[in-house]
UniProtKB/Swiss-Prot annotation:
It is an enzyme of class 6 (ligase). One of its GO terms (biological process) is tyrosyl-tRNA aminoacylation. Catalyzes the attachment of tyrosine to tRNA(Tyr) in a two-step reaction: tyrosine is first activated by ATP to form Tyr-AMP and then transferred to the acceptor end of tRNA(Tyr). GO terms for molecular function: ATP binding; RNA binding; tyrosine-tRNA ligase activity. Pfam families: tRNA-synt_1b. Homodimer. Transmembrane segments: none annotated. The gene is tyrS. This is Tyrosine--tRNA ligase.
Length: 415
């Protein structure tokens, strides 16, 4: 078996796969592999990082990589895996999202060929499409697809019904113009991929070297999709999800999910992954596996400097407590990662009054009890006096960090 396919199978990534012989012939003939990116959002999220990882594995095995951005199809929306009609995106948003996704792909795959399908659809008429694509795919074939069968009762528009033909045409276009022989995608893309293979077979003959496969859906042990926190999706764009938030999200993953996560989104080989899992299982409470996962992913996505910053922030917030050692940029990262309470305050006020106005405690009595128990720290100072006035030493670059115990941290910024 080809070394690329072997690595994917060793990591248990493949769900469905077409004719392996054709895929291997495609790879022997130096044909490329592609995956599509839907610009319905302005950033790729961590759950979708899996497909970038597969492209990176392909690159490692010297397979030409192609990323197709749906600048045209994004305006329609892929119905795969959806229970109802998707809301259409306006053209300006679509263009901005397309450019943002393109930039992210370039960051991880600077040598990959990036194709925007709006570039070849803008010159294709509807009549041309019916002649060049619709003529080769039977309606009965399309009706047999799960996405269509699942939506017939609730209703499916012609736009969504025809979507698989458009994606099939994408594949055929790349096959003919960019020497691409393999398409892969998420677990919900099998119907679209096989329609593309059918179009290539009909238009180019049985012996054409083309194939496809899908990647398993990355699920956590509780059955939920990976890549979303309680606050929403974990995006690769640091302006949408800070590196610190991503780091903490990965640190909080369950032991039972570690093997899957390393296989799906890290760049480590099987041997190295198993060594980490073995070492982790010796002392799970130390969370060695989670730390290695967080380090690997944050370093790859945001770089070494960002990783160093988030590690330092974590150590200060949850280990040594030296809040005043935080740099200005680290405070900025924290503000973008935590819930921040905006309150107007001055240095001649009592700390207890500022905390009360911030509404982070139920009452002043609760704050007084904490002070009596020496359980309230503001900045690096344990507060022991109900009448303690806010001092410069209680501020970190103008921000109040109030700690209740070891794990609860409240942030107050001047409004």
């Amino acid at each position: 078996m080809n070394s690329f396919l072997k690595e994917l199978q060793e990591k248990n990534l493949i769900q469905d796969i077409s004719n392996i012989e054709k895929i291997e012939n495609s790879l022997k003939n130096k044909m490329g592999i592609y995956v599509g990116f839907d610009p319905s959002a302005k950033s790729i999220h961590l759950g979708n990082f899996v497909v970038i990882n597969v492209l990176l594995i392909a690159k490692k095995h010297r397979i030409p990589t192609v990323a197709l951005i749906g600048g045209a199809t994004g305006g329609i929306g892929d119905p795969s895996g959806k229970k109802s009609e998707r809301i259409l995106i306006d053209e300006d948003t679509l263009k901005k999202n397309t450019e943002a996704i393109k930039k992210q792909i370039k960051h991880f795959l600077p040598d990959a060929k990036i194709v925007n399908n709006s570039d070849f659809y803008k010159n294709q008429s509807f009549i041309d499409f019916l002649r060049d694509v619709g003529k080769f795919i039977q309606v009965s074939y399309m009706l047999s697809k799960e996405i269509v069968k699942n939506r017939l009762e609730s209703g499916i528009s012609f736009t969504e019904f025809a979507y698989s033909l458009i994606q099939a045409n994408d594949f055929h276009y790349l096959f003919k113009n960019h020497n691409v022989g393999i398409q892969f995608g998420g677990s919900d893309q099998w119907g679209n991929i096989t329609t593309g293979l059918e179009l290539i077979r009909k238009r180019n003959g049985e012996n054409s070297f083309s194939g496809g496969f899908t990647i398993k859906l990355l699920l956590k042990s509780d059955g939920t999709k990976f890549g979303k926190s309680e606050q929403g999706a974990i995006y690769l764009d640091p302006s949408l999800t800070s590196p610190y938030t991503m780091y903490q999200f990965l640190l909080n993953q369950n032991d039972s999910d570690l093997l899957n996560l390393f296989n799906f989104i890290s760049d480590l080989g099987i041997k190295e992954i198993l060594e980490i899992i073995t070492k982790h299982s010796e002392n799970p409470e130390k969370r060695y596996g989670q730390k290695m996962l967080a380090n690997n992913i944050v370093n790859r996505i945001h770089g070494k400097n960002a990783l160093n910053e988030v590690e330092n922030i974590s150590n200060i917030l949850f280990k040594n407590g030296k809040i005043n050692d935080l740099s200005k940029s680290e405070v900025s990262i924290i503000i973008n990662s935590f819930e921040v309470n905006h309150v107007n305050f001055s240095n001649d006020e009592k700390i207890i009054d500022i905390l009360d106005r911030a509404k982070i405690f139920k009452s002043k009595n609760e704050i007084r009890k904490l002070i009596e128990q020496k359980g309230l720290v503001v900045g690096a100072e344990i507060i022991t006096d109900f009448d303690q006035i806010l001092k410069d030493s209680n501020l970190t670059h103008g921000v109040i960090f109030a700690r209740q115990g070891k794990k609860k941290i409240f942030i107050i910024k001047k409004s």
